[in-house]
């Protein structure tokens, strides 16, 4: 069932340049009220205008709800949202902020928690580390980045979590040895990873190699994982009695929008769940991060902003 988000008019109260490519944005509600409560790992949808909206991990303190904070890495080859945030979203800018949702929560139990971050993937771990510290849990952050000038938030983290933070700098030849890290953990350790897809894949593969159960491996990635060389296919819209060809370089959502059919989709990254659509016939190749593995295997619904057809035809409840 499609997810729906309550939206709050907000204003940007502070913009900080943390690295050459990363800015931190602080938001307040326009009505002066507190934002909803959230837990570490939660994301929000930032709606910049009618065309642009992106999902970002909340990185602010879970106890201070007067503001929300996110970090945005500028990606000139992306959909345009990060460029808008960097180039046009200044202090005083009015935008829409969604209520938080958490698809990347901390496990409630576990002997130890290993957090692995690459680049901008550090953001969800800030509130999570605070939560783990408050629990008195055993935890470590392993943070890899390209060069010292790209080490967003490292000083803040090492000050708050001394002895729990380990950093790896590509430009200095300091590499994270995943096999050594994963294999040396006690039984019952949870592993979390957020960062570029190659890092996520490597962590998952390493955990599988050392026989970690699926429920002990947690990952989050907002960048799209849709292959660029997909095949064209046909989509039949059962309710509107229309048929459309989805080209290899199109998403189903983009194709449907050419018919002027309105489908709600906030993130366009397979994260928020707002475009979830029932599958009446055919099978989907799932690329979203919203549905569970079991839900994907059931082939009952799909996220039309990123997922595609396995075969030549899909019939959707639209």
Curated annotation (Swiss-Prot):
Disruption phenotype: Mutant cannot grow on carnitine as a sole carbon and energy source, whereas the growth on succinate is not affected. Mutation abolishes trimethylamine formation from carnitine.
Keywords: 2Fe-2S, Flavoprotein, FMN, Iron, Iron-sulfur, Metal-binding, NAD, NADP, Oxidoreductase
Pathway: Amine and polyamine metabolism; carnitine metabolism
Domain of life: Bacteria
InterPro entries hit by this protein: 2Fe-2S_ferredoxin-like_sf, 2Fe-2S_ferredoxin-type, 2Fe2S_fd_BS, Benzoxazolinone_Detox_Enz, Beta-grasp_dom_sf, Carnitine_monoox_B, Cbr1-like_FAD-bd_dom, DmmA-like_N
GO biological process, one term: carnitine metabolic process
Cofactor note: Binds 1 2Fe-2S cluster.
SUPFAM superfamilies: 2Fe-2S ferredoxin-like, Ferredoxin reductase-like, C-terminal NADP-linked domain, Riboflavin synthase domain-like
One Pfam family here: FAD_binding_6
Reactions performed catalytically: (R)-carnitine + NADH + O2 + H(+) = (3R)-3-hydroxy-4-oxobutanoate + trimethylamine + NAD(+) + H2O; (R)-carnitine + NADPH + O2 + H(+) = (3R)-3-hydroxy-4-oxobutanoate + trimethylamine + NADP(+) + H2O
A GO MF term: oxidoreductase activity, acting on paired donors, with incorporation or reduction of molecular oxygen, NAD(P)H as one donor, and incorporation of one atom of oxygen
Enzyme class: oxidoreductase
2Fe-2S ferredoxin-type domain location: 233-318
Requisite cofactors: FMN; [2Fe-2S] cluster
UniProt-listed Enzyme Commission number(s): 1.14.13.239
Residues the entry annotates as binding [2Fe-2S] cluster: 267, 272, 275, 305
Domain FAD-binding FR-type: 5-107
Function text: Converts carnitine to trimethylamine and malic semialdehyde.
Family to which this protein belongs: Belongs to the PDR/VanB family. CntB subfamily.
Protein name: Carnitine monooxygenase reductase subunit
Source species of the chain: Acinetobacter baumannii (strain ATCC 19606 / DSM 30007 / JCM 6841 / CCUG 19606 / CIP 70.34 / NBRC 109757 / NCIMB 12457 / NCTC 12156 / 81)
Gene name, Swiss-Prot/TrEMBL: cntB
